Structure formats: structure tokens, C-alpha cells
């Protein structure tokens, strides 16, 4: 009943929104939250709160602490967050510029979040999924893995800026550490770093470079587990346990709650949008 009432109110909320059927990218059925709210309760939980759904697969009485309720917004909060990611005449979402060094970066006076991860971790796909309600956004993708050598800046209306960092690991640019380290250490309006980890292979040696930088500079960061549609359920549960243990025992600045996502099924995407809207100060949620 609650979901039904919310579906009606959300429908009214977005009745004046932009037409989502046009644009260069094809749309998944679940890009818009109004469609997600039509799902039965169990499927809705799996799509919106994937960590909660995974938690249910552990044996009762021996379930690990996955910090499920640190950020657990209401469905209404998640629906409100979607408006920040929906392009309109009054909310322009667009690629802004690229920079090879911090002193080339635009001097913006709005909150900023950055996405960082190994080459082929699915960073570009995740950013496309986050911006799927703004189909005209041109997400910059290198033709060859690891060849992105620039910081790509995306303007999200008047609300915040999303920065796509060069991928590290395989064939990363030689000056990767200097470029990224300078940005992380000196960018004053950086609110949160989103560190992407492939849920198929877990934390790799190359990931420790980014983790160590975040810890050294005392930066608040979040681990996002990508490609959760790829591994088997058993393998995914194993990876979640291992990564959660790492966060709990080896980190100081990492947000305790993991964010599993799939850019293919949109599982976890709506929750991640809501988290970004919250930590950039644009949406006061009941999540915390």
C-alpha cells in the first residue's frame, strides 16, 4: 500500500518532467523510479536495496553485520533524489570540460564527487547509468582501456559536479599517481570519493593505491561494488563478506556501508543517486 501511494505521488511529481523516450541511449525499464515502484515488494527490495537482499541469503543467526541501516532512505527520499539526475530546461546536466592537471580544472563553487577505479571496473557504464535520465550527456570513454589521461567534469545543474578520474592499473598513464593524488589532496570542494571495486574479482593490488591515498589524506570515501549481475550469488556473497571485513578492519575513512550496483539491471543505482544527493547537501533524507 505504501509503495502504491508513493507511486501515485511520484507520478504527479514527475508529470512535468522531460520526455524520457528520446535521446541517444536506449532506456532500461528500471531507469525511472516510477517503474521500479510497480514491482512486487521482493523484487523492489532487490533492485533498490541490493545489499539488504543479499543479507537475506545468509543463514539466520549467523548473518554478518553489513551496516544496512547506516544509509537507508525512504522510498519517497529516493524518488525525490531522482529529480536531481533528470535533465530539464531548468536542470542542465552536461559534460563540462576535461583537465590533465588540477591547475587546468574549472574553478567551481559547488559540491564535487569523484569516481575512481581500475581500468575495466565499469566506471563509465556506472556514470552512464547514473545519468540515464539525461540521455544527451556525453560520457567520455577511452577507446583503449587505461588510456584515459584526463579528469572529466560533469555539471549536474546548479547542484554538484561529478568528476570521472583516469582508470588505474592496466596501462594507466605514467603520471596517474601525481595527477590523482594532487586532485584528492587539494580539491577543496570534494565532498566524497567513490572507489569502484569489481565484485567479480574483489579488491586488487592496484586498488590499494587509491585506498592508501584516501586514507593518507583522511578523505571520506565509499566503496561501490560494480557488476553485481555478473558473478553467481554464492561468489557475490563471498566477495561482499571479504570486502566488508576489509572495510571494517583495514580502513578509517571508508563509509562502513557498501554500495553494490549493476549498470545493466540498475540494481542499486537509485540508492546511489540518493546517497550522492544527500552527501552533496542537496537533499535532506531520513537515510542517516
UniProtKB/Swiss-Prot annotation:
**Pfam families xrefs:** MMR_HSR1
InterPro entries listed in its UniProt record:
EngB_GTPase, G_ENGB_dom, GTP-bd, GTP-bd_ribosome_bio_YsxC, P-loop_NTPase
Specify which residues bind Mg(2+) according to the UniProt entry for this protein. 124, 148
For this record, an example GO cellular component is: mitochondrion
Q: Which CDD domains match?
A: YihA_EngB
Residues bound to GTP are 117-124, 146-150, 164-167, 226-229, 261-263
Q: Which GO terms describe its molecular function?
A: GTP binding; metal ion binding
Q: Which UniProt keywords apply?
A: GTP-binding, Magnesium, Metal-binding, Nucleotide-binding
Q: Where do the EngB-type G domain residues begin and end?
A: 109-282
Q: Which cofactor does it need?
A: Mg(2+)
Among NCBIfam families, the record links this protein to:
GTPase_YsxC
The record's family statement is: Belongs to the TRAFAC class TrmE-Era-EngA-EngB-Septin-like GTPase superfamily. EngB GTPase family.
Which HAMAP family does this UniProt record tie to the protein? GTPase_EngB
* Name of the protein in its database record: GTP-binding protein 8
Q: Which organism is it from?
A: Bos taurus
Amino acid at each position: 500500500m505504501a509503495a502504491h501511494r508513493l507511486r501515485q505521488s511520484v507520478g504527479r511529481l514527475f508529470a512535468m518532467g522531460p520526455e524520457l523516450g528520446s535521446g541517444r541511449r536506449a532506456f532500461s525499464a528500471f531507469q525511472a523510479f516510477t517503474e521500479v515502484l510497480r514491482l512486487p515488494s521482493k523484487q523492489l527490495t532487490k533492485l533498490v536495496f541490493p545489499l539488504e537482499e543479499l543479507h537475506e541469503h545468509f543463514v539466520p543467526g549467523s548473518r554478518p553485520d553489513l551496516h544496512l541501516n547506516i544509509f537507508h532512505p525512504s522510498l519517497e527520499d529516493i524518488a525525490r533524489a531522482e529529480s536531481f539526475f533528470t535533465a530539464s530546461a531548468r536542470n542542465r546536466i552536461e559534460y563540462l570540460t576535461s583537465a590533465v592537471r588540477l591547475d587546468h580544472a574549472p574553478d567551481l563553487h559547488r559540491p564535487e564527487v569523484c569516481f575512481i577505479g581500475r581500468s575495466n571496473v565499469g566506471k563509465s557504464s556506472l556514470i552512464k547509468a547514473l545519468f540515464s535520465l539525461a540521455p544527451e550527456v556525453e560520457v567520455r570513454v577511452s577507446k583503449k582501456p587505461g588510456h584515459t589521461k584526463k579528469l572529466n567534469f560533469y555539471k549536474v545543474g546548479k547542484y554538484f559536479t561529478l568528476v570521472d578520474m583516469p582508470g588505474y592499473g592496466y596501462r594507466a598513464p605514467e603520471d596517474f599517481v601525481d595527477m590523482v593524488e594532487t586532485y584528492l589532496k587539494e580539491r577543496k570542494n570534494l565532498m566524497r570519493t567513490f572507489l569502484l571495486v569489481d565484485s567479480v574479482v574483489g579488491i586488487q593490488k592496484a586498488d590499494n593505491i587509491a585506498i592508501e591515498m584516501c586514507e593518507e589524506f583522511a578523505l571520506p570515501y565509499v566503496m561501490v561494488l560494480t557488476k553485481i549481475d555478473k558473478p553467481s550469488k554464492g561468489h557475490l556473497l563471498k566477495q561482499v563478506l571479504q570486502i566488508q571485513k576489509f572495510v571494517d578492519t583495514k580502513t578509517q575513512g571508508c563509509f562502513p556501508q557498501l554500495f553494490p550496483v549493476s549498470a545493466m539491471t540498475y540494481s542499486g543505482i537509485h540508492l546511489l543517486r540518493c546517497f550522492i544527493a544527500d552527501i552533496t547537501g542537496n537533499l535532506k533524507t531520513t537515510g542517516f
